[in-house]
Amino acid sequence: MLDTSIQALINKWQKYLVLQRNYSNHTVISYNNDLKHFLEFMNYYNSELVTINHIKTADIRLIRSWLAKRNCDNFTASSISRGLSAVKNFYRFLEKTTQLNSHIIFSIKSPKKTKLLPKALSEDDVVISLEHIEEYGNVKWVELRNKALLVLIYASGLRISEALSITKLHLQNLEFIRIIGKGSKERIIPWLPIAKNLITQYLEILPYKLGDNEPIFRGKQGKELQPSVFNRELIKLKHFYGLPQHLTAHSFRHSFASHLLEHGADLRSLQELLGHKSLSTTQNYTKTSIKHLEAVYTTAYPIKK
């Protein structure tokens, strides 16, 4: 439970993130959850309802205790780092809007993240997935929605959040999709006919009327489709066909990148298609491709000694 004055500050902070910093709704929700977790811990730590004075005077021992609790609760290094970033962001907002001076929290460094290589699916697993995803949905328009969405992600390398933001306006250009990705960075993705045709077929039987600016992928009740709902459909597919455990909507984006690289795409082009700010992020796919080639060599090369 939060003091009403603090909740009002949080509401202003959220509006600031959306309107002035152009943060996505997904990021704002994640940041809000992280901040509330921090404030709930502060409630417990101080044994009383948090006030603005508690927030302003929070010391390094409290903050490190909160980070340690997250670690004990099995949060990943990435989640802990994001949580600290969220709280720091809130404190920066307080610096701009209240009398808060530079706070000790800005001296705390984020934990080092373990670099995990992206896991792609084999081309065979992708084919199986695309052929059978329509079997899950119960009604025709949902089945077609699932296939159209999965083909779109694999054919374009979109993040699930980007794919779910597609509107009718995106369909008006016959050659490319203009995507606003992480950090409000714009990129141009070529339309593949198979993806656009499936989306057109899906919209023809969608039982809900949509405006040009509304996301086209809908849930069964007509609301915007959530990533978790689509991933549940993929879990059913994965279990029934014995597909890899790492199969998720995001794994098809990884597969898009890895398969293009294996078929001769250059890193700079791939960086543009994926919307990576840094080429070093894209270079992770070269490591997975090398591992794939090593595996092929080990199992198939006739001279192994």
UniProtKB/Swiss-Prot annotation:
Residue span, Core-binding (CB) domain: 4-95
Subcellular location: Cytoplasm
Keywords: Cell cycle, Cell division, Chromosome partition, Cytoplasm, DNA integration, DNA recombination, DNA-binding
Any one Gene Ontology cellular component term annotated for this protein: cytoplasm
Active site per the UniProt annotation: 159, 182, 250, 253, 276, 285 (o-(3'-phospho-dna)-tyrosine intermediate)
Gene Ontology MF terms in the entry: DNA binding; tyrosine-based site-specific recombinase activity
Domain of life: Bacteria
UniProt record, GO biological process: cell division; chromosome segregation; DNA transposition
Predominant place of localization: cytoplasm
Annotated function: Site-specific tyrosine recombinase, which acts by catalyzing the cutting and rejoining of the recombining DNA molecules. The XerC-XerD complex is essential to convert dimers of the bacterial chromosome into monomers to permit their segregation at cell division. It also contributes to the segregational stability of plasmids.
Assembly information from the UniProt record: Forms a cyclic heterotetrameric complex composed of two molecules of XerC and two molecules of XerD.
Protein name: Tyrosine recombinase XerC
